[in-house]
Amino acid sequence: MSSDEEKYSLPVVQNDSSRGSSVSSNLQEEYEELLHYAIVTPNIEPCASQSSHPKGELVPDVRISTIHDILHSQGNNSEVRETAIEVGKGCDFHISSHSKTDESSPVLSPRKPSHPVMDFFSSHLLADSSSPATNSSHTDAHEILVSDFLVSDENLQKMENVLDLWSSGLKTNIISELSKWRLNFIDWHRMEMRKEKEKHAAHLKQLCNQINELKELQKTFEISIGRKDEVISSLSHAIGKQKEKIELMRTFFHWRIGHVRARQDVYEGKLADQYYQRTLLKKVWKVWRSVVQKQWKDVVERACQARAEEVCIQISNDYEAKVAMLSGALENAKAEIQRMQHEKEHFEDSMKKAFMRGVCALNLEAMTIFQNRNDAGIDSTNNKKEEYGPGVQGKEHSAHLDPSAPPMPLPVTSPLLPSPPAAVGGASATAVPSAASMTSTRAASASSVHVPVSALGAGSAATAASEEMYVPRVVTSAQQKAGRTITARITGRCDFASKNRISSSLAIMGVSPPMSSVVVEKHHPVTVQTIPQATAAKYPRTIHPESSTSASRSLGTRSAHTQSLTSVHSIKVVD
């Protein structure tokens, strides 16, 4: 490009960021400037001009005056001259401004293509550069203006110059734009090549890594295959050796079996010979033994028979002595058992007598207690004491005089009152005082009297053995609400003394006092009408006594016997 062309070239406003740096954007800007100068400059009222003249006549006058003013005022400004000449060229620019604006509207909102090279071949540039409809419209408008208005040669020359400058500026702009596109395309191509090279290098590096990994894997596989080959070779060698061993063992065992069979045949022959020799020896030995047995059998039988007879005689003598001794012991035992049975019967009779005497005395004492408590029956009680008193005392005297009889329990006159001592059997016998306790309850059912009695019989060389037995029997009456019950519990403890006698070796045994419970139910006070009922106390009803006898014999001394008898009697006085 020359400097003159650059000097007179039209100014280009480049908006690379918004317009995309295209030729169509520059042309659009130039058209906008021309329209600006063509529309804003006139000073004519639009209403008057529209009413008096038609639209086709008014526009050229205004535009011609505007062009002359611009040319005289701004002759040095190329842009203004260009605009004035362009406007003075005819009214087709103004008329077709709307069509130009409509045609260039796609340029105002261009689509940025994906590639700068494609921008050069876009439809906008081709539409702006070569459009036959537009050229024809321009020529038609120019002919109309020329035919309508007379233009001077000077103005035509100026317009020609302006068009030349414009075409040169357009050429330079197009060339510069193409050079920019070329440079941009070269830069883009370089960037794409760089990216492709980087991708190619990365892919190549990846392939190299894969190749290295495959090489390492190949090495490991080769090593494993070599090891497997070694194992296979070693196993094949071992199998060959094992086959050789098996063949050797097979031949050895075949030889050994043959050898063992040969030895077995030899051994069997030897055994047959030995068996034959032994059978002959056995036959000879049996014959010799039979002869010897016949000779010695009689001698041995005689000796054994004599020895057996001696042993049998000795055993029979021993057993006869033992039988005689045991028969004597049996006779002694039978005599002792018979004697003990007689003693037992005598003891039972004495116990029954003593028990009856004690029960009678206790019943009389109980009746005296009832008579003392009731004021209405004092006379009948005194008469009964006078009637039965001497008999009781006579029984007591007879009991004291009889040495074999057991001691009688003393009557209880008042609670917690000791009884006087009594001599039993001889001077060495002493009586232990007895205590009686009586508890009376008036609330519901009964009152009870507990009388423990202990008697002691002693000898010069006797040891004491004590035993306490409690056998209570309580009989109450629930039929009469006003009745009272007195329960007397008697507990006796006796000490037996045994004395050895030289002549008869019999032991003197003490008699234990009876243990009994007497229950007397009284429903009404004792009066003259109840005396026949009180006489029943003399003959009480007897419950079957339970007696237990135990006898023991000591090993070193004669036998000592211990007997205990327990009896329970109850007397009921009922209306």
Swiss-Prot record:
InterPro entries with a match to the protein in the record: POC5
Chain positions found as N6-acetyllysine: 538
Keyword Zinc-finger attached: no
Name of protein: Centrosomal protein POC5
Gene: POC5
Localisation: Cytoplasm, Cytoskeleton, Microtubule organizing center, Centrosome; Cytoplasm, Cytoskeleton, Microtubule organizing center, Centrosome, Centriole
Swiss-Prot/TrEMBL keywords: Acetylation, Cell cycle, Coiled coil, Cytoplasm, Cytoskeleton, Phosphoprotein, Repeat
Coiled-coil region: 191-222, 316-355
Assembly behavior: Interacts with CETN2 and CETN3. Forms a microtubule-associated complex with POC1B, CETN2 and FAM161A. Interacts with CCDC15.
GO annotation terms (biological process): centriole elongation; eye photoreceptor cell development; negative regulation of centriole elongation
GO (cellular component) term, any one: centrosome
UniProt biased composition (Basic and acidic residues): 382-400
Function field: Essential for the assembly of the distal half of centrioles, required for centriole elongation. Acts as a negative regulator of centriole elongation.
Homology family: Belongs to the POC5 family.
Centrin-binding (CBR) repeat residue intervals: 142-173, 231-262, 263-295
Post-translational modification: Hyperphosphorylated during recruitment to procentrioles in G2/M phase.
Entry-annotated residues carrying Phosphoserine: 105, 109, 564
Polar residues bias spans: 545-569
Region described as Disordered: 1-26, 376-411, 538-575
